[in-house]
UniProtKB/Swiss-Prot annotation:
Similarity comment text for this entry: Belongs to the TrhO family.
Key words, A-Z: Oxidoreductase, tRNA processing
Protein's name according to its UniProt entry: tRNA uridine(34) hydroxylase
The organism of origin for this protein: Legionella pneumophila (strain Lens)
Oxidoreductase as UniProt keyword: yes
One GO process term, biological-process aspect: tRNA modification
Family matches, as InterPro entries: Rhodanese-like_dom, Rhodanese-like_dom_sf, TrhO, TRHO_N
Cited function: Catalyzes oxygen-dependent 5-hydroxyuridine (ho5U) modification at position 34 in tRNAs.
SMART domains per record: RHOD
PROSITE patterns: RHODANESE_3
Molecular function in Gene Ontology: oxidoreductase activity, acting on paired donors, with incorporation or reduction of molecular oxygen
Domain of life: Bacteria
Domain Rhodanese, chain residue ranges per copy: 123-217
Lineage of source species: Bacteria, Pseudomonadati, Pseudomonadota, Gammaproteobacteria, Legionellales
């Protein structure tokens, strides 16, 4: 049995006091023994952390004790080893950095599709299936027939849209990422530009892999994750792909 719970979460919500939240959260992580990284910004919170079951449930309750976080949803995976080496709480301009001002996923994100709905939807040949992740993530694994935007970081995605999709505002566009947060921003951004039919995989690739049997899955390869596991297979088990020595990535994205 895998004893370590690895949780990822995010919420877009205005946090005018986000700077003052850093020290209390970090202190609680140290007190409980939780390891991982939490990002705070004016637009909300994003993070991934791990511990044993008792530690995690205590920390869940602590975070939810703030009324603004009472409905936080923690997406869990499991391992025999904690994939984080320390506790960190960072202050940023954005909880996932796209670099576009006035994009508000809290009210204008794309339509959510459950894994089962997504599985059927992306088999429609009229749907544009777009991987919003970085090129190194795409190379490890992606959905069958997904388009690679060929970007090195998330900040390049808006430029990709402007160069390649701006004339497709009437098309059905389905977007996905690891845990859902990047799709919240990309779909909101595209709706602001006037795209009419924008969809996203609810809770991301990890939710799909957990929900759809491997024999039926349209996922091909491994799924990159933003911790020391590096990637997981279709059973959400840790794998160790051979990566370039200069391999770099941004752990805060999901």
């Amino acid at each position: 049995m895998k004893d370590i719970i690895i949780a990822s979460f995010y919420k877009f919500i205005p946090l005018n006091d986000f700077e003052s939240l850093r020290e209390p959260i970090l202190t609680k992580m140290h007190e409980i023994g939780i390891k991982g990284t939490i990002i705070l910004a004016h637009e909300g919170v994003n993070g991934g952390f791990a511990g044993n079951r008792e530690q995690m449930y205590i920390f869940y309750d602590y975070l939810r004790s703030d009324s603004r976080f009472a409905d936080l949803h923690f997406k869990e995976t499991y391992d025999n080893k904690n994939p984080f080496d320390k506790a960190k709480v960072k202050l940023r301009k954005e909880i996932v950095t796209m670099g576009v001002q006035k994009v508000d996923p809290s009210y204008n994100a794309g339509t959510y599709l459950s894994p089962e709905e997504w599985h059927q939807f992306i088999q429609d040949p009229n749907v544009i299936l777009l991987d919003t992740r970085n090129d190194y993530e795409y190379e490890l694994g992606t959905f069958k027939n997904a388009i690679n935007p060929d970007i090195e970081n998330f900040r390049e995605f808006p430029d990709y849209v402007q160069r390649n999709l701006i004339d497709k505002k009437d098309k059905k566009i389905a977007m996905f990422c690891t845990g859902g947060i990047r799709c919240e921003k990309t779909t909101a951004y595209m709706k602001e530009l006037g795209f009419q039919h924008v969809y996203q995989l609810h809770d991301g690739i990890l939710n799909y892999l957990e929900s759809i049997p491997e024999g039926e899955s349209l996922w091909e390869g491994k799924c990159f994750v933003f911790d020391d596991r590096v990637a997981v297979d279709q059973k959400l088990d840790r794998v160790y792909p051979q990566l370039p020595q200069d391999y770099k990535y941004e752990r805060e994205q999901k």
